[in-house]
């Protein structure tokens, strides 16, 4: 699954991850995992940054943004 271009993310995004439904999110702090995706646990900001096909391998998509 292609991920959003790093250069197009808001500067504050430090983590990138995709949920099972295919939605890509940018997070200010490392998100926590739940059964179908990721959440920010009320700490930091998050922003929707893209949509792709549902991904059964979503749990492997969490990446730190350089």
Where are these regions (language model features)?
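Amphipathic alpha-helical oligomerization segments
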Residues: 4-24
């Amino acid at each position: 699954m292609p991920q959003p271009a790093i250069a197009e993310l808001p500067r504050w995004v430090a983590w990138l991850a995709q949920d099972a439904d295919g939605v890509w999110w940018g997070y200010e702090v490392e998100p926590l995992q739940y059964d179908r995706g990721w959440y920010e646990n009320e700490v930091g900001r998050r922003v929707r940054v893209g949509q792709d096909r549902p991904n059964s391998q979503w749990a492997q998509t969490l990446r730190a943004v350089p």
